[in-house]
Amino acid sequence: MTISRHTHHRRRPPLAVLSLLLAVVAMVLGPVPASAADPGWWNPVARPAPDSDINVTGEPFKGTDSQGRVRGFVDAHDHLMSNEGFGGRLICGKPFSEAGVADALKDCPEHYPDGTLAIFDFITKGGDGKHDPNGWPTFKDWPAHDSLTHQQNYYAWVERAWRGGQRVLVNDLVTNGVICSVYFFKDRGCDEMTAIRLEAQKTYDMQAYIDKMYGGPGKGWFRIVTDSAQARDVVQQGKLAVVLGVETSEPFGCKQILDISQCSKQDIDRGLDELYRLGVRSMFLCHKFDNALCGVRFDEGALGTAINVGQFLSTGTFWKTEKCTGPQHDNPIGLAAAPSAQSKLPAGVALPSYAGDAQCNTRGLTELGEYAVRGMMKRKMMLEVDHMSVKAAGRAFDILESESYPGVISSHSWMDMDWTERVYKLGGFIASYMSGAEGFSAEAKRTDALRDKYNVGYGYGTDMNGVGGWPGPRGADTPNPVRYPFRSTDGGSVIDKQTTGSRTWDLNTDGAAHYGLVPDWIEDIRLVGGQGVVDDLFKGAESYLTTWGNSEKHKSGVNLAAGSSASASSAEWWNPFVNFSPGRAVDGDSGSRWASEWNDNQWLRIDLGSANRVGRITLDWEAAYGKAYRIEVSTDDTNWQTVWSTTASDGGLDTARFSGVPARYVRVQGLQRATQWGYSLHEVGVYSG
C-alpha cells in the first residue's frame, strides 16, 4: 500500500480512526487471530495470512479411555521433509515457510512454464509430465494422488489430520544418494547423512514455526518426542506426537562396492550415536539398494529395472536371486524396460536375466548388519524390517527373538506378510500402506484375528512425499461416497471438505491428494470396511507406544552358559591350527565354534556350575546345522528331561522357549544333520527366561 501526499488541505482523521485503519491493515496483511466463535486451545493465537483452511470444528479429544489407554490414529511412515533430500529438487514445495503459504507451495523452477522439464514426474506418472506448475492459490494440477513430485505435507494439512484424530506421526528422514546423483536437477550435494541432518533440523524448525502461532515454545500441537513417556503425555494433552525415523540407502556411509563394505563397526557406532542425539528412535538399515548391512526386497516393473540399474551404477553389482527356502519371498524382480535408466549403463553392460522360480535376494543380513541391529537394541531403538530381503529379515527376527526384544516395526507393507505373527509375538507393531479403502480394509480384515489374539491395534503408513502413489477417487457416483460434513471417529469434531486458496478437495472425486485428506480417507474406510477396521486403527497410538515403551524397558538376559565347562560326543579335528573343541560354543566369541564328527548321533553338554532356573536357550548355528535335535536339561547329570525339540530347523539362530525349569546341565542332542558335515555351533546361550 502506497500513501501519497496532496497539496490541498483536508481535515485529518481522528487518531482513533487511524488506529482502526492500521489495525485492519495488520489483520489483512499479518497473522490471523483465533476465531472468536471457536477460541479453543487448539486454535492458533496468530496464524499467518493468507493460509490454508483447516475445515474442522470441535475440540480435539484428550486424555485416555477408561482403562488408561491413549487413543488415536498412528501414521507410522511419512516424509515431512523429503523436499530437502535427493538433491533438493525432486520433491517440489515445502511443508512450511516463514515467507508464507505462497512460498511454501510453489513448484520447482524447472517445472515452469508448463512442466516440460518435470522429468521425474513423467518417469513416475507416465505421459509427458506437462502440468500447470502453479500451486497457491489455484492448485489446478497439484497436489494430486498420482503426482509423486509435489508437496503433500504442508503443515496445515498435517494439522487437519491431527484435528481428525491422528495422535502419532513417524517422520522418516529420507534421501537416496544414487537417485540424487543421476537426477538432472539439484541445488546441493548428495551425501545422505548431510541430508538427514538437515531434515532433522527442519523438523525442529517446523515445530518452532507452529509454536510461534500458539504463543511460544512448547505451546503448539506439533511435538517432537524422544521417549514413549513423553509421547504419551503429548497424546494425553490432545496433541500430535512426532517421532523421528530414518529411511535411507547408505546409513553411516555403509554402502558396498563390488561386495566390499565401505564402512566399519566404528562408523556404525558413531552413526547410531549421532542419530540418537538428533532424536531418531526408529530406522531402516537398508532401502532400495543392497548395502553393506543387508540385502533389499526388490521393486517390481520398470521402477525395479531402474533401481537395479542404479544399484549397478552405485555398487558395481546387480541384484542376485536364488530360490526361496521357505514360504516367504521377495517381490518378483523388475524386468520391464526402463529405457532412460538402461541408457546409463556402460557400453557392453546389460541387465541380467532372472529365473522365474528364483524370487529371493541372495543377500541377507551381513556381519555388519547384525552389529547394527544389536547396536540399535543397545540404544533401545526400533528396527524397521520393511525393505529387508527375506533372508535379511529372517535373520533379524532370529536376533530379536533370541533377546526377546520387542522393538520391531513394519510400517508400510514392505514386509512379507507371512512374518506378521512373528512381529506380534515379539510385541512389535504393524501398519499397512495407505492404499484404497477397499484394499486397505481387505488387508486389515485378513489380519484381524492375529490382532485380536495379541490384543493390538493397527496403523497406516501414508508414505506421503515418498514417491509411492496414493488412493485415487472412487467416484462421485459410488453407492456409498463420503458425505460432507462428517463426524470424527471420537464424535467430537465435524470435518468438511478441505479448502486451500481457491481449490477445494473432495475425496470422492480427487482421491487422497494431500495429507489433509487422511481423515476423509479414514471415513471412506469406515464406509467400505466397517467400523471394526476404524476401531482397530483408533487403537494404533496405544499399541505403537506400547512397543516403544517395552523396547525402552528391555534388559538383556544374563547368559548362564558364558564361560561354562562344556563337553561333547566328539570334536572335529582336521587342522592342528584350528580349535573346534566344545568350549568354543560358550566362549562368547561368535567367530569361533564347536564342530562335531560327521554323523547324526552327536551331542554337546554344558555344565552351568550350579542349578538355575532355565526357560530360554539360543543356538547360533554355523552352516553345518541340525535339522532335527532336542534340548535336554538335568540337575544331576543322570536324569535328563527334554524341554524342547524340532524336526524342521532352518539353521541360523534358533531360540527355544519353554516353561522355566531348574537345571545345572544342558544338552543339545543331535538327531539329524541338515548337511553332509557334522553339527557346528558358534554359541549356545542359556537364560532364565
Regions found by a protein language model. Give the residues of each.
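Residues that line or immediately flank small-molecule/substrate-binding pockets and catalytic motifs
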Residues: 173, 287, 390, 412, ...
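Secretory targeting and sorting signals
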Residues: 2-36
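N-terminal hydrophobic targeting/anchoring segments and the immediately downstream early-domain regions
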Residues: 37-362, 367-374, 393-401, 408, ...
